[in-house]
């Protein structure tokens, strides 16, 4: 295939390749999530819109953080695994005792992942983790990214 050029159309035939189609699905979903979630853009240039949950899990190469909206509602929790090892019961600390809704899972089949069924809602419990008073466990896939709204 040819390198991208503003002078010609994209190589749309590449979408016949499943890997290219999976990447298109991923980018499409990311753009949709960006448009629908003010936490990703309202406080983009302020530290008030970002909070680390855990940036120090070097042993497992996993980090987690929160993106916040101005009104504090519909914040997003990101959990990212940078190893091929699935963490079947990865516990992540969270700031509030509520339900966290999975809105993006990179392991979904539409993105080329395993397509394993996972619950959508995760209720936090009063179990301290990552310096937070509450937490929940999630089956984090290898090389996976999970995004939760709360």
Model-derived segments and spans:
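Carbohydrate-interacting/catalytic domains
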Residues: 1-150
């Amino acid at each position: 295939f040819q390198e991208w050029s503003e002078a010609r159309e994209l190589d749309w035939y590449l979408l016949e390749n499943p890997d290219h189609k999976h990447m298109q699905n991923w980018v499409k979903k990311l753009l949709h999530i960006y448009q629908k979630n003010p936490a990703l853009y309202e406080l983009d240039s302020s530290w008030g819109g970002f909070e680390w949950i855990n940036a120090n899990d070097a042993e497992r190469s996993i980090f987690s953080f929160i993106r916040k909206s101005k009104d504090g509602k519909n914040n997003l929790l990101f959990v990212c695994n940078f190893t091929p090892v699935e963490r079947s019961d990865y516990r992540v600390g969270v700031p509030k005792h509520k339900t966290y809704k999975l809105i993006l899972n990179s392991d979904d089949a539409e993105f080329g992942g395993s397509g394993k069924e996972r619950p959508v809602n995760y209720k936090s419990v009063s179990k301290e983790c990552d310096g937070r008073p509450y937490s929940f466990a999630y089956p984090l896939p290898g090389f996976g990214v999970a995004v939760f709204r709360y």
